[in-house]
Amino acid sequence: MTIAERLRQEGHQIGWQEGKLEGLHEQAIKIALRMLEQGFDRDQVLAATQLSEADLAANNH
């Protein structure tokens, strides 16, 4: 494997991992918003999902 191939493979793996984390974060936001719609306490939702207030504010349409 050449250096270029190795770097390309590492870049692909890093991109995949970042995408997976972003997807998990988006799912946590969806769950949190659903919980809030159902009347859950905001502080408990933030604690359970490990999201920040800014995460919810930025995604609360």
From Swiss-Prot:
Highest taxon listed in the record's lineage: Bacteria
Biological source species: Escherichia coli (strain K12)
Classification of source organism: Bacteria, Pseudomonadati, Pseudomonadota, Gammaproteobacteria, Enterobacterales
Protein name (database record): Uncharacterized protein YpaA
